[in-house]
Amino acid sequence: RRAFPGVTRGGGMLSYFTELNRKPVPRGVFDFVTHTVCPIVHAADDISVMETLESLPSIFASTRSMMGKTPYHLGPSGIPCRDNPYGAAVAGNSENGRVCLADMDPRQRGLFAAAWSLGLAAAAARGGLDAIALGAATGPQGVIYRKASYAQPWFDGGNAAVYPAYHVLAGLAAMSGAKRLDVASSNS
């Protein structure tokens, strides 16, 4: 703190909750604690990816119990993997498949990622997180189309400038600071 007075310091893991759980940060040292989530670590089929949203309340509650009242920020999270804490690299996915620990996932460019991102944001709001980062502006976890080294069917050669998740982020940004309203379905 002497070297950088007034600078906010965060601690945690650049990877997932699992690593934070294995090596929790000491309380009172950081101004916020962070980790990321990735739904394609263990399985990459559509149902399994959406089911990862069901684990978030437990992850958020466990993290909160470790860190007390320290602000809780969820780092950049999307369907593709940013890094592989379990190996040398993330898996390549030039064929646009559904691949575990892949650096690129075609669902990130579609309605699937928009729905998953909204589910993540809703779980984070219910979990009392102080800030979240969903994906990235461009690239494999991006919300804005840019030509890439991998094929992006429908977007390459098309007129679309943004992916559906962009609209989720824009809507969430417009509601920043608004009161959260809990709703429940009778189809439990």
Regions found by a protein language model. Give the residues of each.
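Amphipathic alpha-helical segments in well-structured domains
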Residues: F30, L53-L56, S117, V162-Y166
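Domain-level signal for soluble alpha/beta catalytic cores
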Residues: R9, V162-L172
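Generic, ordered loop/turn and secondary-structure boundary motif
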Residues: T18, I144-Y145, A173
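Carbohydrate-binding surface patches
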Residues: K179-S188
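Noncatalytic carbohydrate-binding groove/subsite architecture in carbohydrate-active enzymes
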Residues: R1-L111
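A structural motif corresponding to the C-terminal end of an alpha-helix
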Residues: A3-F4, A61-Y72, G119-A131, L172-R180
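Aromatic/acidic polysaccharide-binding cleft in carbohydrate-active enzymes
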Residues: G75-P164
